[in-house]
Amino acid sequence: MLRWAFHRWEEALHNRSNDRIVREFDWGLDWLPDLASRDVAADTDASAQDRLDAYAAAAVADSDAFFASTDTAEFDLDRQGHLRFPSQVVTPHAENNVVHARLYRAPEDRGRAVVVLPQWNSDADGHVGLCRLFNRVGITALRLSKPYHDWRMPAELQRADYIVSSNVGRTLQVCRQAVLDARRAVGWLHGQGYSSIGICGTSLGSCLSMLTAAHEPRIKVAALNHISPYFADVVWDGLSTRHVRQGLDGHVSLEALRRIWLPISPQPYLERMRRLQTLLVYAQYDLTFPVRLSQSLVQEFRTRAIPHQLAVLPCGHYTTGKSPFKFLDGYWLTRFLQKTL
């Protein structure tokens, strides 16, 4: 009965948005400028799917190169705490090529800071309350705008469709961009004297946070809020991405999509999390990050004996943002970071 009630509530909250667009399928090879330069993908007579398969396999095999980040000196922090810096990845949209972040300083942070990545389609105020909650326990927070979100969204968009869509190559590249942006944000915090740095992400932000933590040695702890081992499976089976699935259907199988999007999935990088302290959070009645996927990732951590803490929310995905569940979620995230940073 309780499951049925939460699922009905989740569906109702999902249906409040009527601006979702089913976009045309595209392999998106033009979004991967280094595709032709990789020997494994250089056979231009191969099909688009085969080329992306080879590209993804090479990216996972050398993920340090795929997610290699270069620091920049071009940071601009204004008096309101708005930080801007150039993205390492250049896309066709000028707005998206400038990274925006908002700094929330804790009065006595003792060198502790966390990069915060909100959920997919969050607006500019998403997770600001959480940042201020972190401030209350002495942790400075840097709230990062993901690619194609809020300040970075071109006029042609109403939603952040270009980071998760039926354009396969674009999704791969823009999620990679998000990780490189987060690594530059960590570099800025480190340059400001912060010695104990964590990362906290929700939903899509959680996936990107784990990818960042797995490849950024300056990150010590990761709080992952809504979890799955595979990017493709969430898009394929999740409530929030039904319209994306519609654009994919008939063009690519789940198995093929899982292979192509493996570089932006947590699964290949689990062993890299062994050096960190990690909090895994999932919701018991989640339809967007299906519970079987969340439990699968938890089991992977357990089987491999990777250090972690676990919290299970008694709600769904959308309802995590509703009272009283948002307070419980915030408490678990804050307590974890307070104890581990």
List the predicted regions and their residue ranges.
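Conserved acidic catalytic loop of the alpha/beta-hydrolase fold
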Residues: 179-195
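The feature captures the conserved acid-bearing segment of alpha/beta-hydrolase catalytic domains
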Residues: 237-293
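C-terminal catalytic histidine-bearing segment of alpha/beta-hydrolase fold enzymes
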Residues: 295-341
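Proline/glycine-enriched tight loop/beta-turn segments at coil->beta junctions
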Residues: 94-99, 105-114, 136, 273
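Cap/lid segment of the alpha/beta-hydrolase catalytic domain
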Residues: 116-176
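Gly/Ala-rich beta-loop-alpha elbow adjacent to hydrolase catalytic centers
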Residues: 201-205, 209
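N-terminal targeting or regulatory segments adjacent to alpha/beta-hydrolase or S9 domains
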Residues: 1-84
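Hydrolase active-site cap/lid region
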Residues: 210-256
